[in-house]
Amino acid sequence: LKRKLTSKKASRWLIVGIILILCGIVATVWSVNNSKKKTPHHKLKPQPALIDNTSTRPASYTTKEFKNLLSQNYPDIYKNLNFKQKPTFYVIPGLIQSAAIKYTPPGQGQPGIAYDMDPQGLAIIDHKYLIISAYSKSKTFDSVLWVLDFKTGRFVKTIALNNIDHVGGITYDEDHKRLWVATINQEQRAQVQSVPLKEIEKYNFKKQKKPIKFEHGTNLSAPLRTSYMTYHKNKLYIGYFDKVQGGQLFAYKLNKKGLFKKDKMQDGLALPSENWSTYSQIQGISFDKNDILLSTSYGDLNSQLLIFKNKLNKPNYNLDLSEADKTIILPPYMEQIIGKDGEIYMLFESATALYRQNPNLLHMDRVIKLKVKFKGLENSKE
């Protein structure tokens, strides 16, 4: 009898042991599979400080310093950042130095290094890339595009352009896989040029040592210059402002191929299908669901994000400051914005070489993401 009891106890302990081993194996497999599903941002090795002569590190602050300064100076902005979805910030490359094509002699037309690049435009490509456009403040170098990995924030490459334009407006047409860039023609009038995604992915500045080629270009009848631009539902929305005449926004309807309609041309200039008056200090525009987002900035005063319900189809409707449904205060020198998936991506130029000399300025050396459903101090009609 004792032998039987001892045998039963041994069998029980053996079963318990097997169960524990199986649980351990299942837990290990689940842990490994789960870790593969998530992008291990915290395990990514730091990139080199320079990649092909373009700086990849923040120009002004460490991540900890940046968070502290933003939370101290703009606490409501800080509270509305999305810390759950990584990356929280995108470091703006090229602010310390950037590869570029020399515009002026000596070395005109040759690759060189620019130390005064000023970020202006922002675009997101298929949740794959985030692109920042920049121009040389001294006009010594041609303008560039910096390409970042959208999911990790890591720098990918620099794309050289064949002009010294402000490139304040860039936008991606996800329907036709085409990036549009606002430029200026030889008559100093506004034009837009495009490059297909496949060419962006193929381009290698280090090997080619020359600017990327635009595929299409169209001269515009209005505005005379371009301050900002966005693509939305087969239309390009292009705007401009000056301090005297205020702001204007023009819509250009594209054809099925995503290009300007030939029957909407006059004297070689594309004609807009619609136009609206806007607030006079608009730097960026974007659409997100039923909202229109406008960024305003001028000088070293605080910037503003204006959120409107989309009523562009209503007659006599204008995007004036008084019509905004919500106004959010942000740091100075905000440029282009993008509304996407309930978040607003914001680019600033306050960390350029020129503005870094101002010790009283918060140098926004990163693109930040703000929730559209902002909670905090704001002016709202709701």
Would you name each region that the model predicts?
Residues 2-109, 366-382:
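Sequence/structural signature of beta-propeller modules
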Residues 277-278, 315-341:
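Conserved blade-ending motifs and adjacent loop-strand segments that build the rim/top face
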Residues 117-120, 146, 150-178:
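Blade-loop segments of beta-propeller domains
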Residues 59, 63-70, 102-141:
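Beta-strand-rich domains and repeat architectures in extracellular enzymes and scaffolds
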Residues 273-315:
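Loop/turn-rich, solvent-exposed surfaces of beta-rich toroidal or solenoidal domains
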Residues 139-146, 187-199, 244-255, 300-311, ...:
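Structural motif
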Residues 110-115, 159-163, 217-222, 273-278, ...:
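Surface loop/turn motifs at the tips and blade-to-blade linkers of beta-strand repeat domains
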Residues 112-126, 168-177, 221-237, 283-288, ...:
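Structural signature of eukaryotic scaffold interfaces centered on beta-propeller domains
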